[in-house]
Amino acid sequence: MITMQCLHADLAQAVRRLLQIILSLCAIAVFAGAQQVDIVAKLRLAQSFEQTGVWDRAVTIYESLLESNPQNFVILEGLRRSYMELKRYDKAMELVRQQLRGNPTDENLLSILGGLYDLAGQPQTADSIWHVVIKKDPKNANLYRLIAAQLVDHRQYDKAIEIYLEGREATKNQSLFVEELASLYGALHQYESATHEYVKIVRANPQQMTYIQSRLSSFTGREEGRRAALGVIKDEVARNKEEVPLYSILAWLFMEGKHYEAALEQYRIIDRLTKAKGSELFQFGQRAAQEHAYLPSAKAFREVVDGKPAANIVPFARFGYARAIEELSVENDTIARAPGQLSSGVGRGSTISETQPTFQGAMALYESLIMDHPNTETAMQALFRIGTIRFTRFFDLSGAAAAFDKVRTMPFSSNLMYEATLSLAEVQTARNDLGRTRGEYDRLLSSSPEPYRDRVLFRLAELNYFEARFDSASAVLQRISGNATNDLTNDALQLLYFIQENKTAGQAALTEFALADLMVRQRKYSEAIVRFQSVLTQHPTTALVDDATMRIGELQLLLNRVDDALAVFRTVTNDMPASILRDHAQMRIGEIYENRLKNKQKAIDAYEHVLANYPTSLFVEEARKRIRMLRGDSL
């Protein structure tokens, strides 16, 4: 019995001791946890002072934290950074020395110590420490990187380059540090040296060519940088005549400098070396067209077609050639400079040439493509282009409508079907069949995908404006202008503000103006001038007078009445002192002298007038640019 009592007493005592131990451990854990929370809070506060540049406060907190956490890497690094920002290099050095006591051969700490001596104005000591690091293992590339990183941080790019070159020599590896050296050479505007380094990369790994082009572009945007790179690549190509990546970079550099003919020559070589059967030339033609270099684009596409191309690219190359001829015709065909004239039909014997392109020639190419590749998406695109030329260049409304109608029956591209319907509606507007125009837009609105709806809505708003339904037009325009990401937002806002601003001046004046705008859309230019002049005579006190006068000037230009256009614009600048369009009118005078009359001096005088009389105008920068171009100054 006594034994049992003793056992119970011993057990109770053991339990009490265990509970005491558990409670003690809990108390210690709670204390440690509280301490840890306090450390984290202080550390965050110090880091926030760092981020805001309050370095003194950061130092105070880091120093207090270091007393209880002498081995904490985060605290040590934060304190060293703060000392460096305050230029307390001696304290930063002492901090690093304390760390080195535990590991006196640590390369990273030694390189940092050397960097601190360098910042403190003791470069010889810094060099000595750094070379101690390097001598530990002269063939270890990472040691050179450690030292160079310190020099780069201090913006001592020349010395960093020396370290990298020393590393190359020691390791007998000329491929080391290529990207690092290229970047440093570029930063020092040593473009030839930078290009030599990038060439090493692309020769070792041709798949890196696109990446190297992006790196070269960091300085080839400057003419001196592009010229330097061009010289290096030309020399490399001359020494390595079978290396396609070098030709590709050379072609790219020519393209960057807008030297498309020279780029085309490189693509001919690339196509031959790679046995690409025209696909490389085809890609060049596409890119040149995207950059509006239509003559070399046309040459490339024609060479593809005339060669022995892969069968799958033939229709696309023919379409690309036709598109290039079409674009070249804009500047060379007399119809393009005198819109509104009608053209005779296109004969099969029409002459087609890159040097004397015509819209008739372009249409002949499209028609031939349709005949040879019927019932294809390419044929559908060609037919759409025929409709566009007939409408926008020849104003052949019947021919355009027939083409667009046929495109809508072809099932190869829903987007082209929508575009054809939009264009057909424009043809109906030009025919003054506004009821059919509205019907086309209503059908599109109910069936077209989201990207087309705002375009359709804007056209409907214009139609409402032409028909003097100004409230309806405003309601539709407000829907469009509410979408800030829409490409049409600015156009919608301009028309909306124009309607709202001028509707209060009187429905009759705005109705007359809108009818004149409709006649412009229908290319009834002479009748439109009469309508705008009616606004001037019948509503002389409205704000529409300024806009009507400017419209008359533009229409005189479209009718090739250049002197009359100049007279109208001078009326705005000289006789309408309250007009907010005087700067625009003066700018148009300069543009007429520059582009239509080819009188360089009078154009310069007109642009200088913009600078002198309208210093706050939005046209000032453009006027300055035009003056520099006309004088042959560097832009």
Regions found by a protein language model. Give the residues of each.
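Acidic, polar-rich low-complexity tracts and alpha-helical solenoid repeat scaffolds
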Residues: 35-635
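Bacterial Sec-dependent N-terminal signal peptides
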Residues: 1-40
